[in-house]
Amino acid sequence: VGSEMCIRDRDEVFSISYDETKDLEEKTLFNMVSAFANLQNGTTTRSNATSFKIVKESFINKEGEFKKQEQATRAINNDDITSKICEIEFSNGSSIGRAIVSANANFPALIAFIPKCSSEKMMEQTGASKLLHASKASYLYNTIKMKEAVDSLRLPTLEKISKELEIPINEVSYEAVKNYITITDAEPTTRSTAVQIGDIEMQIYHDKSIFPLVKTNWGQEDPYNGWFSNIDRDGLRDWVRTQDGGKNFTSVPAGCVNIAMAQMMTYTHCNKRPPVAFLIPTGKYEVQTGMTFIPNWDQMTKTPKLDDPGAGGIIDAQRLILDLYIENKTTSKKDWDNAVISSEVSEQNMLKTMNKYFKYQAKAAFNGDMAWAALRDKHLVLMLTSDHAFIISGILVTEKAISTRELVKRNDVYWHANLGWADECTGFYQLDSNANTYFQANAVQEWAHKMDYLNNIYAK
């Protein structure tokens, strides 16, 4: 090989490094999760991932998700990509977390990172399972687009390198020429210190990332619905289904819409002047005095959760949540045995309350570029699925490389989703709004995941 230096952009380098290799080893996948967890130590969602194990494996391609590789590859053409997806459980202090990782050596990715996920049932209840489906679809869409780039660039790149280095084209490979390549399109940007764990190097783009604006991590049960038992009003206490399948007569869940609104207010309304006063909730037989209170936002946000050591403003938070529960005309959804399984708010009632307290853009299909612009302006995003509402208030842009192919760096974008179930399933998820458009246009219903949002939310 001659001594000339080839100048290449990232996509060209990727096209010649693409190789039908076997899947990444377990150790590399664990290193990827560990590196991502270590990056979090500079953010609000501090994590320490240890003792990893793979709890579930599946194979995804554009035809769907399959338990066995043979089923997956039978469903598609030879040219199509099938990626092995691993769900990795890790211990994170006293709780169990979960990471979703692609083991495809050509397209390795950490698809979602959830510091606390206690069960599959909790994934369903919080809406995280739908969000994960959207994350997998986003990953799949990006691999399809990258493979298209590989297919179009590979031969022209091989020909150029062969000509520049004066070697036969059949001798050009990533391994043979990597020491002669300089990448020119790496953008100058502020990064954190790189985290190197085993064979994975990862870093955060600080000037592109926005750490979560909403600092609370509230839930729907005790202590958040604590004021429900203090006043006599129909529907606030009932037989409620428990996690283990039993039922208790207790306060009903606060509802994800009410928790989302209350948590957004801790950010949007904390510095509002004059401050907004809320009605002190009263019982059905009490005289309606019209007395109000102004929440002490500083006290309420002293700690992420209201049951953390040193938490403050608990009564204000409980009153605010009940006030929103009443204002949103929240109702109980019951199962076959007449036990409450969730608290629901109609879209009409939600928008009426949103209009009272917030300014925002009209409901629309999720658009990643517009959501990112809102976060840059320090405004919030409320995501809406058919039966869940959750806050996006941060975005994380990372760059990773595997030491065997250190020139092939990939950027990943993660949205910080606060699902309103205390710590459960709140975390970082890949979401690409182009994925849904692409799969719908190609009539691939399996990966279509329509998600609406209210964008650019701030105090009225």
Regions found by a protein language model. Give the residues of each.
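Short, small-residue-biased leader/transition segments that mark boundaries at the very start
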Residues: 1-7
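Noncatalytic regulatory segments and standalone regulatory/sensor domains
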Residues: 14-18, 34, 75, 79-194, ...
